[in-house]
Amino acid sequence: MNKLLVSPSPHIHAAVSTKSLMRDVVIALLPAVIVSIVFYGFKELVVLGVSVASCVLIEYLITRYLLKKPSTICDYSAVVTGLLLALNLPYTTPWWVVFIGALFAIGVVKMTFGGLGQNIFNPAIAGRVFLLISFPTYMTHWEMPAGLFGADAVSGATPLGLVKEGLLNEQTVSQVMSESGLSYAQMLFANLGGSVGEISALALLAGFVYLLARKVIKPYITLSIWGTVALVSLIFWLAAPDKFTDPLFNLLTGGMVLGSCFMATDYATSPMSVKGGIVFGIGIGFITLMVRYFGSYPEGMSFAILIMNATVPLLNMWFHQKKYGRK
């Protein structure tokens, strides 16, 4: 009997299974996971372990005992959600907060809508936002990396948080950058406070290149996000460089790389057409910058992705793909 291979839309015209796709995403995330463990130490292992194990267990229990269906945990999608959720959390997050985030991501956001391919919102992003609203103290407490065998870490702030706080204290962006010792090399390679997924843009970009090489994702959503962020931030920066950060800063900090490369490109929660995907990416980039520049939160990537997730049905209707053989 031939084996039917199914994946969430948009469908890939090749014999590629959901399991294979998700396995590639796990492999692509490994550089960031390894760097996070090296820089954050054993506490990060706890966050990663609890997040992945909780997502897998919760999906198994719901599928087998509530939905009365065969288990879907072997397709690796729950593992991907667990890894992405962990990378969106501070490494100091208590294990029970991580578990609640996993319960919301899988139990509410994913399985309530019927499982993989049926969910409207990205589960990992929704889990992070839920925790940010419910447990702001844990989600906004940052410590600088102590290392795998390092001493106790010291409290710190994210680059976006430092700039936001400095501007509120009537400092200029250049003053904040100078006094804090922030450098673009740090942003690209590692050693900054923030969520685990903010530790190294280079490690995340390596995973992104792997996904492109494996043809797991297409680059147009990510590139439209980057292009929008670069263009809009350039306009603001040229108009008032003392008040607004430059394009490179915005491209390398916060959840920009993780969100644009691994979560905005999620098949189930992004548009099916290229035109729809480009509009989707433009919206994410613009909303992210507006939150960063004018919102109360330093970072806006998570909110931007969730907002644009909600527009996907409309974008699919507006930019529907032409049926084969029709003009």
Region annotations inferred by a language model:
Residues L84-L89, T93-A153:
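Membrane-interface helix-loop-helix junctions at boundaries between adjacent transmembrane segments
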Residues I120-A124, P247-G254, G277, S296-M308:
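Loop-to-transmembrane alpha-helix initiation sites
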Residues M1-R23, Y293-K327:
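Cytosolic-side transmembrane-helix boundaries in multi-pass membrane proteins
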Residues P123-L205:
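Long hydrophobic alpha-helical segments that form multi-pass transmembrane helix bundles
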Residues M1-V56, Y60-T63:
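N-terminal signal-anchor module of multipass membrane proteins
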Residues L57-K69, I106-G117, A206-K215, C261-S270:
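C-terminal ends of transmembrane helices
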Residues D24-A32, V47-E59, S77-G82, A86, ...:
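Alpha-helical transmembrane segments in multi-pass membrane proteins
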Residues F42-S54, T92-G101, M187, N191-A201, ...:
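Structural signature of hydrophobic alpha-helical transmembrane segments
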